[in-house]
């Protein structure tokens, strides 16, 4: 007898339908799984047969062939356990599975028949809805995540026996309920705020400029100056995510297994802060069956790299593609996967190995060669992709002790939103440009024209401050953003002057 059950598997950030065929025939008792299964899928034979027996059902005693179609795509993970078990029970008890055609099933089975949580349930639910399925059966722990998808019934099941009894009409089971729009509207608040940060007004201004134009930023300062504290609050002033951005971000976190019962949907900008010992694969993504890395988990949010020179050179170099293209392509013999990775890079570093170069209160123990060598750990091509460099001095006592209320994130975000709206209108006809940071050479010439005074200012700065040639385009882009924050149609000398201040690393005077 042949039984057909439908499931789904994740490939990249999307899911595709998998048809599971279970066929029982006479002969020596053996279970064969075909259709490019990985080790976890092959091991499901032992898990499933034990779970079926412990749930009080029988499994076919003859030769059982399990086919996972389409056969040209490798299947990975234990999420096929539940549908395979249902197919085996249906074959054993000679139940017609044609009534199951409008259902889809995912879930890992424990040996006692309990259904365990799996990764990637959100894209699976979206695919099931696209395929016109009436219902999706998922582990109870994943039910709220899947219930964010409307127009399809989501059933969170506890064990194999409960699932089969419901399908036979023996017990009732209520679908999980979720209102994505309502959840999204009520979960866009942050636990931190810029009003928590005392002083550092010029650094806050630089961060505001960076956010307003979508620029990457590097902060340089001694230990304890507040670089990490400032960085953790940057997401709070980025314009709020749209519902489409939130769904795309949640799909990536679902695939990576970064969601849980309390956080079934990502409604705020992600903030990722990997340790400097992270591997290339951990940062970029990859593996035998590629999973998203930190650059993709930071998609639509902030990637914070603290102690930037301490990261491996190879790890920093692999970031050049996602910074340039906004996506990560991972190639394997079986094909290529693409993960989105449009994030704002926020990096922080000490000015020297001891951390106190240029400090007026503590003596630096590093020589000029050590400082230069420390700085050179960051490659030129990576610095090319960071538009703003800002020095973060130690906080003065008068700022720490001040009772003056600091500006909240909401006020800063309002200004950033207005600047972004101007840029959206400016680049409405540009497919790959949505903010000033992504302007091409053609767009720079079109939208960043300087008057004579501004040109003279840039010329003097590049000559007197020994700014590198690569800094020129960055100055123009940042000047355009500062003008947008002022609501100015044209770039003025004061906009250029401020932009020049944000090129610390291009000044040979720095060392």
Language model: regions and residue ranges:
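Short loop/turn elements that form and flank the Walker-type P-loop nucleotide-binding site
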Residues: 59-62, 99-100, 132, 150, ...
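Short beta-strand elements
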Residues: 18-24, 283, 387-390
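Walker A/P-loop
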Residues: 219-260
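Walker B catalytic acidic pair
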Residues: 300, 306-307, 318
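Conserved inter-motif catalytic segment of the P-loop NTP-binding fold
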Residues: 245-279, 286-287, 434-442, 469, ...
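Peripheral, non-AAA+ core regions of ATP-driven protein-machinery
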Residues: 1-218, 222-225, 331, 471-472, ...
């Amino acid at each position: 007898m042949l039984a057909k059950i439908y499931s789904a598997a994740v490939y990249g950030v999307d899911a595709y339908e998998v048809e599971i065929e279970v066929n029982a025939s006479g002969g020596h008792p053996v279970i064969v799984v075909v259709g490019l299964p990985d080790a976890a899928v092959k091991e499901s034979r032992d898990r499933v047969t034990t779970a079926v027996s412990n749930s009080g059902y029988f499994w076919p005693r003859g030769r059982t062939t399990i086919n996972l179609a389409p056969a040209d795509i490798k299947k990975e993970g234990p999420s096929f356990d539940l549908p395979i078990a249902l197919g085996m029970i249906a074959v054993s008890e000679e139940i017609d599975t044609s009534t199951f055609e409008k259902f889809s099933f995912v879930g890992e089975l424990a040996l006692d028949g309990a259904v365990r949580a799996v990764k990637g349930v959100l894209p699976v639910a979206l695919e099931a809805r696209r395929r016109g399925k009436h219902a999706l059966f998922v582990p109870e722990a994943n039910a709220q995540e899947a219930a964010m998808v409307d127009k399809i019934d989501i059933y969170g099941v506890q064990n194999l026996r409960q699932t089969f009894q419901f399908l036979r009409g023996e017990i009732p089971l209520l679908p999980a309920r979720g209102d994505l729009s309502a959840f999204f509207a009520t979960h866009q608040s942050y636990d931190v705020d810029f009003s928590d940060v005392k002083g550092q007004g010029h650094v806050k201004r630089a961060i505001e400029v960076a956010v307003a134009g979508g620029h990457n930023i590097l902060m340089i300062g001694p230990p304890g100056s507040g670089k990490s504290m400032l960085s953790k609050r940057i997401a709070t002033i980025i314009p709020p995510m749209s519902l489409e951005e939130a769904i795309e971000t949640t799909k990536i976190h679902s695939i990576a297994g970064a969601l849980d019962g309390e956080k079934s949907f990502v409604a705020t900008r992600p903030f990722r802060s990997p340790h400097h010992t992270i591997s290339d694969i951990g940062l970029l993504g990859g593996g035998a069956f590629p999973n998203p890395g930190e650059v993709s988990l930071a998609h639509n949010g902030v990637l914070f790299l603290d102690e930037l020179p301490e990261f491996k050179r190879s790890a920093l170099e692999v970031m050049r593609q996602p910074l340039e293209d906004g996506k990560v392509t991972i190639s394997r013999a079986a094909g290529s996967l693409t993960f989105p990775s449009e994030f704002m890079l926020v990096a922080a570093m000490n000015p020297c190995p001891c951390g106190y170069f240029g400090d007026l209160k503590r003596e630096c123990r590093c020589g000029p060669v050590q400082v230069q060598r420390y700085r050179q750990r960051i490659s030129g091509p990576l610095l090319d992709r960071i538009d703003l460099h800002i020095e973060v001095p130690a906080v003065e006592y008068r700022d720490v002790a001040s009772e003056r209320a600091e500006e909240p994130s909401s006020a800063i975000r309002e200004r950033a939103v207005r600047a972004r709206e101007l840029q959206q209108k400016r680049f409405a006809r540009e497919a790959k440009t949505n903010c000033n940071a992504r302007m091409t050479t053609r767009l720079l010439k079109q939208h960043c024209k300087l008057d004579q005074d501004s040109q003279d200012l840039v010329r003097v700065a590049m000559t007197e401050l020994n700014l590198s040639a690569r800094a020129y385009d960055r100055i123009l882009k940042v000047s355009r953003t500062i003008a947008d924050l002022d609501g100015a149609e044209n770039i003025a000398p004061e906009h250029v002057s401020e932009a020049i201040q944000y090129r610390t690393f291009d000044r040979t005077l720095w060392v």
